[in-house]
Amino acid sequence: CFKKMKNYTFNKKIFKYACILTTGRTGSDYLQGCLDGVPGIITFSGEVPFYKFIKQSRVQSFLRNREYNNLIKLFIKKHYNLFYKDKLENKELNINTNRFIKIFLNLSLKKNLDQKIFLKNIYLAYHLTLKRKILKSNTIVHHSHHVKETESFIKDFKNTKLLITIRDPRANLKSGIQNWFNYDKKKRSLEHSYLYLRRIHDDFSYALKKKNKYFVRL
């Protein structure tokens, strides 16, 4: 399998791109779960804060020096929840990380990776690790979750479509605040409740500004 992949390249035209943007606690993980495994959809099992990761000085050093083996191992270490166990989402995963690394390196070793190619290759490697097919038409779905991550992804992939999850504001507010209270007792304050409410407003305002060019109604 790996020998055949060494000289294999994917036509850029067969890929489209989409982001999942949440507006609070609105079911973005559920949406991604529904898309996971759909033929032609290439995605991870959860949120991927890629652009926060890529800004780290150590990551930039690995990219510059083409230390791709160290780079992908660090990615796995920093995104443990995507490969092994996601405690927050209560998910048990059993991804063959050795296979993932081999496939990623086969896709990357002959290239000078920038952040855009790196991001694309980790998605392809994950998809192929799960023994899923690359079809004639594919959509890479990035669970960006937050506005900053979404903006960064759109800058790299210009024709990205946004998949935006929304919910009744009252249920959204109650669920979000209660979830944070259960997760971190320090968040039990009016200040955090206000910040959460403001985040819902800001995320949805951003989504509305993008609706003409990027917005996809579900």
Where would I find each of the regions flagged by the language model?
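The Walker A (P-loop) glycine that initiates the GxxxxGKT/S ATP-binding motif of P-loop NTPases
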Residues: 21-22
